[in-house]
Amino acid sequence: METLDKIKKQISENPILIYMKGSPKFPSCGFSARAVEALMHCKVPFGYVDILQHPDIRAELPAYANWPTFPQLWVDGELVGGCDIILEMFQQGELQTLLADVAAKYPQE
């Protein structure tokens, strides 16, 4: 599978998805750690891709997303943004509402 197809598949199969360095339990950079902490406070299920384990995705996603840095939060197929945007939305209560609405649209089996 081509890298771009893999990215599109990941985004379509995960209503809430973060591309990050490391994992939610063991983030490998401060930006990823802060972003995933905000997501975890929202108490909704989310997927993640560790870009350190997937150099092809790390190389191609910035061009596809037109967003140069990581982490990247994708919600319902749309790029929300990186760490600063995630934290700003969380502090304003917008992230919690967005994620709760999307999680309700896609109940876990």
UniProtKB/Swiss-Prot annotation:
The keyword Iron applies. Residues 4-106 form the Glutaredoxin domain. Glutathione binds at residues 21, 58, 70, 83-84. Its main location: cytoplasm. Disulfide bonds: none annotated. [2Fe-2S] cluster binds at residue 29. It is found in: Cytoplasm. Signal peptide: none annotated. GO terms for cellular component: cytoplasm. InterPro entries: Glutaredoxin, GRX_PICOT-like, Monothiol_GRX, Monothiol_GRX-rel, Thioredoxin-like_sf. GO terms for molecular function: 2 iron, 2 sulfur cluster binding; disulfide oxidoreductase activity; metal ion binding. Keywords: 2Fe-2S, Cytoplasm, Iron, Iron-sulfur, Metal-binding, Redox-active center. It holds the Pfam family Glutaredoxin. PANTHER family: GLUTAREDOXIN FAMILY MEMBER, MONOTHIOL GLUTAREDOXIN-S14, CHLOROPLASTIC. Homodimer. Belongs to the glutaredoxin family. Monothiol subfamily. Monothiol glutaredoxin involved in the biogenesis of iron-sulfur clusters. This is Glutaredoxin 4.
